[in-house]
């Protein structure tokens, strides 16, 4: 399938998406988007299950999420609305599986982005991802619910080792498996020109993350970026012998800055703390130096006063002695006369 524009009447975003079958017999990925009362909504889901199960599951997920957000109570927080939407999709998949035995066991990953003037809110389950980029710099990324990424969390393996692992497709969380579903949600401030990419593992599992982000952060027009990325990933799969996974991506670019202010990351906090310590040391040093200078000045004044006093006493002594000498001379002269 060729790229499509994610049409919206909202002034603060623009977006494009593309989905390809890859080297498989069926594309089990699904994606959807809509202008909603809460903002611009995009969702990308990767289905799993034998026969028609995978495609059915991802399609149900997309429909239920979009419908749920459109019908939501606007007095609730966006985070709660997205959690409820994903859980509604989860129950709908389970219900369909119960009604049609051939679909039992089907499931789907899920990524959701709801962006408005206030912030971008992200929800996800499974190993499909959402990236936030500023140029080629990664500002935010979801963390896969998978066996290998649990090992990454424990610092047993690196993310690149996880990507290349034969167990990379074993996920620990998905829609359609159990009724009690944990949904991970994050709220992200954004700057003008930031890009949010939602993608399945057929995209992020094909190349190392640095190479992927370089392609997504390219300064070309967004439509060209999406097309180039899809073609490159498909080409890598074919060059590796084919049989590669379905690949789906949706990229949204912001046209303004969010009202939600960006929180300082750990590195920035450390830098600010370091500057504060340096300022404190500098101020303390200056105060100490001023006290030393003041003490030296006072000591110098005291010495000067003592010196003047001593000099004054010597002069007085000489003067008195001179007077005594004169009197003595007068007395002597008197006696002589």
Regions inferred by a protein language model and the residue ranges of each:
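PP2C/PPM-type serine/threonine phosphatase catalytic domain
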Residues: 1-337
């Amino acid at each position: 399938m060729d790229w499509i524009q994610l049409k919206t009447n909202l002034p603060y975003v623009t977006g494009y998406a593309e989905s390809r079958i890859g080297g498989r017999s069926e594309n089990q990925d699904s994606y959807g988007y809509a202008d909603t009362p809460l903002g611009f909504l995009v969702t990308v889901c990767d289905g799993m299950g034998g026969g028609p199960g995978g495609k059915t599951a991802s399609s149900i997920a997309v429909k239920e999420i979009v419908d749920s957000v459109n019908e939501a109570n606007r007095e609730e927080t966006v985070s709660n609305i997205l959690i409820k939407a994903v859980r509604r999709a989860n129950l709908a998949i389970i219900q369909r599986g119960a009604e049609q035995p051939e679909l039992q066991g089907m499931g789907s990953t899920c990524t959701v982005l709801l962006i408005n003037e206030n912030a971008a809110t992200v929800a996800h389950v499974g190993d499909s991802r959402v990236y936030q980029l500023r140029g080629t710099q990664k500002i935010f990324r979801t963390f896969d619910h998978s066996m290998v990424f649990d090992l990454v969390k424990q610092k047993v393996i690196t993310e690149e080792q996880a990507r290349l692992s034969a167990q990379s497709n074993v996920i620990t969380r998905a829609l359609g498996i159990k009724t009690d579903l944990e949904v991970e949600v994050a709220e992200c401030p954004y700057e003008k020109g930031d890009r949010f990419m939602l993608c399945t593992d057929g995209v992020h599992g094909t190349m190392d993350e640095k190479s992927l982000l370089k392609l997504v952060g390219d300064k070309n027009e967004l439509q060209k970026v999406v097309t180039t990325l899809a073609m490159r990933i498909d080409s890598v799969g074919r060059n590796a012998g084919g049989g590669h996974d379905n690949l789906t991506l949706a990229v949204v670019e912001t046209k303004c800055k969010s009202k939600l202010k960006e929180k300082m990351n750990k590195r920035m906090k450390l830098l600010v703390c370091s500057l504060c310590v340096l300022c404190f040391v500098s101020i303390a040093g200056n105060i100490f130096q001023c006290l030393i200078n003041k003490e030296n000045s006072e000591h110098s004044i005291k010495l000067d006063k003592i010196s003047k006093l001593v000099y004054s006493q010597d002069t007085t002594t000489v003067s008195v002695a001179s007077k005594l000498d004169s009197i003595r001379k007068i007395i002597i002269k008197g006696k002589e006369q």
